[in-house]
């Protein structure tokens, strides 16, 4: 049930922010109630406190910015160790891949 409460309050905060209305616990609770969702009473207060401390628009705009932390580190390591060693490893992987099987007759013909 808590994930429903979090989701409903998140949507309510985004609606209030989009409309330029001040985000309060009462307004969040009113929107959630109008949507017909029953949540625990502490969710609106938690989301209202979060909205006081954070700029909601910045949070929405930076949703995809935090997910790429691991990839640049992994990509930087081979570059520092020498690019010549990385190229043969990629060629070996291509050789090890099994050939794709054909879609030959497997006995499941629809119109047989």
Swiss-Prot record:
Region Disordered, annotated ranges: 85-112
Key words, A-Z: Phosphoprotein, Ribonucleoprotein, Ribosomal protein
GO molecular function, one term: structural constituent of ribosome
Subunit structure comment from the entry: P1 and P2 exist as dimers at the large ribosomal subunit.
Coiled coil: none
GO cellular component: cytosol; cytosolic ribosome; ribonucleoprotein complex
Gene3D superfamilies: 1.10.10.1410
CDD domains on file: Ribosomal_P1
Source domain of life: Eukaryota
InterPro entries recorded: P1/P2_N_sf, Ribosomal_P1/P2
Any Pfam family: Ribosomal_60s
UniProt GO BP: translational elongation
Family that this chain belongs to: Belongs to the eukaryotic ribosomal protein P1/P2 family.
Function summary: Plays an important role in the elongation step of protein synthesis.
Listed name of the protein: Large ribosomal subunit protein P1w
Keyword Repressor among UniProt keywords: no
Residues where Phosphoserine is found: 102
């Amino acid at each position: 049930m808590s994930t429903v409460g979090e989701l409903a309050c998140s949507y309510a905060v985004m609606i209030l922010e989009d409309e330029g209305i001040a985000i309060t616990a009462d307004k969040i609770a009113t929107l959630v109630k109008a949507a017909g969702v029953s949540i625990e009473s502490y969710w609106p207060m938690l989301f209202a406190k979060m909205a006081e401390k954070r700029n909601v628009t910045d949070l929405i705009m930076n949703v995809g910015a935090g997910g790429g932390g691991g990839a640049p580190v992994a990509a930087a390591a081979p570059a520092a160790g020498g690019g010549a060693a990385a190229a043969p490893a990629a060629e070996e992987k291509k050789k090890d891949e099994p050939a794709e099987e054909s879609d030959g007759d497997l006995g499941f013909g629809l119109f047989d």
